[in-house]
């Protein structure tokens, strides 16, 4: 039986800030239990909900050197849905109100976490065959592992995988400070290892030292080899091309199931969505104070409100879009500029725009279930989960062809009667508007074709089962 340890900075249901948590919390459940023993290592944040903290059981503790500092490391454990979760406890590092804070503090916090995760393994009597790291927060794990191998036989032969969920975030800080924090030999701080442009770069170090590198979609794996998407690491990604692969994320089909979802007004399935889905729309219109009209096309947006997500395009054409027979429902938080932008349009067009500037999991389910279309005009999108959720709920995605959006949404072809959504290529506001209006035309004038698009989307399988099989193949070939 192969032993695999996931090391990550967040995981559902314990702590979540983005899609990384969904991957780490969901994927381990879908591996073949007869062939894989998959466990997960996380920080024990003080901001975790008490309902989870109260369930943790103490395993052990020890003290660890972090260069000249000596730090307490506590290990707690929880069995959840058949998976063993280990939590690394240290109140000095993990006592903040949020999992992440200022990068100056996070740099030391995740150096501690990476070293502690490895140092705990001999004491836990768990020797993984593969350690699967996620994003820059665990980028030092392959480097510490390389360093530990020289003096400790326990760590020899352990392989590593690092998954890049978003190359934009790399964990970059002053090289001398990182040398002092980590206690790693100067040997590791050269341009072919941890150093990048005179700074230390955690993610770069992880990519250099990991045995395999994955991203969260095939298209994104190709895109990050180019200067536009490569975030100054395109040369490294080209050099590691033979070890680089893209595996699309999935979603938990038990959590996201319109036939059993308790968050929505009316459950439905691919067999009866034509009659039942519209009842969710009318309930949401009433809840949000929009004009009640079962025939009005409703477009949803559930997102972090940041530049990456293409909201500057929406800003350019929102006035034009609001002249059409549509309603737009927005849920999310982020940059103040975009929060205020959507508040402004909700004030200007109260019957057509609803801006919910917060995040709520039940409200997100209501939007997926109620809307007719879902808009994602991202500048770049490593994978994206929202379009998978919208397909699951029969809400037709309108996306820009980039990264995971390109891989998971097949553009509608009215002549061949194929496709699960609508897409545009260039990062251009009026190209996006033309695509939205094309979707409106099909919705209003060719309702039978629209329902077939919905049907094809609902019949697609983007569950974790498919992703887990591809990760199993990756592990077997290491």
Predicted regions and their residues:
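Catalytic cores of nucleotide-sugar-dependent glycosyltransferases that transfer UDP/GDP/TDP-activated
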Residues: 1-478
């Amino acid at each position: 039986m192969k032993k695999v340890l996931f090391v990550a900075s967040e995981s559902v249901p314990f702590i979540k800030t983005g899609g990384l948590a969904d991957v780490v919390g969901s994927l381990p459940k879908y591996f073949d239990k007869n062939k894989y023993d998959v466990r997960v290592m996380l920080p024990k944040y003080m901001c975790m909900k008490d309902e989870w903290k109260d369930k943790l059981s103490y395993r052990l503790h020890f003290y660890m050197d972090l260069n000249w500092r000596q730090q307490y490391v506590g290990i707690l454990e929880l069995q959840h849905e058949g998976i063993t979760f280990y939590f690394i406890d240290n109140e000095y590092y993990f006592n903040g109100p949020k999992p992440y804070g200022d990068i100056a503090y996070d740099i030391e916090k995740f150096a501690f976490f990476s070293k502690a995760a490895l140092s705990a393994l001999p004491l836990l009597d768990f020797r993984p065959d593969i350690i699967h790291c996620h994003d820059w927060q665990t980028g030092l794990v392959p480097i510490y592992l390389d360093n530990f191998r020289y003096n400790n036989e326990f760590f020899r032969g352990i392989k590593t995988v690092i998954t890049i969920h978003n190359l934009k975030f790399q964990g970059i800080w002053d090289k001398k400070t990182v040398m002092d924090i980590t206690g790693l030999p100067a040997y590791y701080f050269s341009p072919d290892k941890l150093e990048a442009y005179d700074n230390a770069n955690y993610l770069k170090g992880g990519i250099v030292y990991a045995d395999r590198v994955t991203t969260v979609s095939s298209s994104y794996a190709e895109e990050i080899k180019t200067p536009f998407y490569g975030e100054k690491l395109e040369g490294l990604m080209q050099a590691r091309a033979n070890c680089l692969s893209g595996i699309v994320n999935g979603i938990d089909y038990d959590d996201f199931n319109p036939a059993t979802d308790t968050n929505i007004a009316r459950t439905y399935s691919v067999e009866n969505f034509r009659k039942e889905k519209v009842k969710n729309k009318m309930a949401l219109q009433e809840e949000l104070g929009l004009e009640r009209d079962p025939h009005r096309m409703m477009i949803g947006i559930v997102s972090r409100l940041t530049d990456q997500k293409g909201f500057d395009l929406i800003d350019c054409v929102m006035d034009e879009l609001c002249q059409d027979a549509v309603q737009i429902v927005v849920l999310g938080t982020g940059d103040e500029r975009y929060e205020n932008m959507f508040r402004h349009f909700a004030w200007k067009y109260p019957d057509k725009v609803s801006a919910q500037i917060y995040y709520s999991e039940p409200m997100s389910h209501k939007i997926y279930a109620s809307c007719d279309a879902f808009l994602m005009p991202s500048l770049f999108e490593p994978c994206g989960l929202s379009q998978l959720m919208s397909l699951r709920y029969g809400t037709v995605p309108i996306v820009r062809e980039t990264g995971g959006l390109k891989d998971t949404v097949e553009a509608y072809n009215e002549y061949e009667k194929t496709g699960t959504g609508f897409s545009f290529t260039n990062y251009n506001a009026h190209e996006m508007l033309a695509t939205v209006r094309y979707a409106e035309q099909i919705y209003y004038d060719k309702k039978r074709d629209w329902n077939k698009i919905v049907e094809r989307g609902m019949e697609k399988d983007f569950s974790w089962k498919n992703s887990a099989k591809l990760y199993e193949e990756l592990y077997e070939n290491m």
